[in-house]
């Protein structure tokens, strides 16, 4: 599944060139809900099941009984613009029902960034080496488009050890500047997965084979090292 957004939302901000600076966060954490999986019915609890299914791994807590699940909910800011520049002291949750055209999205040091769009996520910066996304752990989702392009990858400048999760219906082109690219799970469903890193490309999972780290119709990697002798990357083609 590429699209984890099950509601269509009107944009919060519409413009040509949108710039937002926040002395806090952009988007918000909106509480949590706890469920017993054994008590959920596909006939009467569709919203709850969709909430669990669409949650990122780090938004889920599963109790030792294997039945109790807590979902931490997050609300993004939806923006429709030709160019988006965001800077926040804390985390950033950005969404959109059209293409998300990123100049710069910069969160606080080590803070999480989520960019989830109904279409594609693209680099619209005018400088070739401009860092588009700056922060900590990163989630990218392009439900019906690509992330970056062959001519203009999305440039990442993330904190040491920050993990990247990316899902795209088509292609993914990512360039990690100034360090390693830590791949939690990168899926280019119907296209090319192309990754460039100034440092190494390493798995973001604790155990090799725990999840598929890289998946696409074809995979291209340019990095100093690929994988680690203690934690191999898990790869799937097709």
Walk through the language-model features, giving the residues of each.
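Extracellular lectin-like interaction modules
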Residues: 1-238
